[in-house]
Amino acid sequence: MKIEKPIFVVFEGIDGSGKSTLCKSLTEKLTERGIPSVNFTEPTNFETGKYLRKFLRGEIDLERKEQIDAFLNDREESLRQNILPSLESGKNVLLDRYMYSTAAYQSGDDLLPETIIEKNLKKNFKIPDLLFYLDLNPAIALERLSQRKENKERFETLAQLEKIRSAYNRILPKETIRIDGVKGPDEIVQECLEIFLRNFNRKFL
C-alpha cells in the first residue's frame, strides 16, 4: 500500500536507550501492514560516515569544530543519497539519529548544543515529521551497554551519558514525542506504531 505522503521519522536517545532496535522494529511493523518504509542510521555507511565511526571508536581524534563539520558533511550525504530519494519514491523514512544527536553529543563548554542545532538549521536540513525520544536513566543505559559484546565507544561513560541527556533536554523541540525507555521493546514499538498511525490518520489499526 502506498500512502499519499511519505513521512520522515527520527529516533533519538542516549546510547543504550533502545532507539536502534525501535527504528528497525517499527520499520518492520509498517512494512508488514503494506506501508512502504525504509530505515537508515547516522553516521551513514558512506565514506563520510566511516570516517566518523573511526572517531567514535577512538581510532582518531578530532577537534570539536572538526567533529561538527564531519557530522554536517555526513548528514548532507545522508539526505542526498538516502533520505530524500526514498521520500521522493513514496517510502516513509525512519532514521536512527539526526541533528539532535550531534547537538547533544558534540556540545561542550566551548560550544552550546543550541549553537550546533542552529548550524544544522542554516544548512536547511529537512525537519522530521515525527521525532521520538527514548528517555532512559543513564545508569540503566550504561548497564545495558555493559552487557553488549561490542567495544565501547568514546561516549559510553556515566558522566558522558548524563551530560548528553541534559543537552537533549535543552534542545529537543516541544513537539518531540517522549517515550519511557524502561518499557519493554515490544510495548515501545506498539506505542510508537499507534502514534504514527494516529498522527497521520491511517486506519490500519
UniProtKB/Swiss-Prot annotation:
UniProt keyword terms in alphabetical order: ATP-binding, Kinase, Nucleotide biosynthesis, Nucleotide-binding, Transferase
Record-linked Pfam families: Thymidylate_kin
PROSITE patterns for the chain: THYMIDYLATE_KINASE
Binding site for ATP: 13-20
Documented EC number(s): 2.7.4.9
Family membership: Belongs to the thymidylate kinase family.
Name the record gives this protein: Thymidylate kinase
Organism field: Leptospira borgpetersenii serovar Hardjo-bovis (strain L550)
The encoding gene: tmk
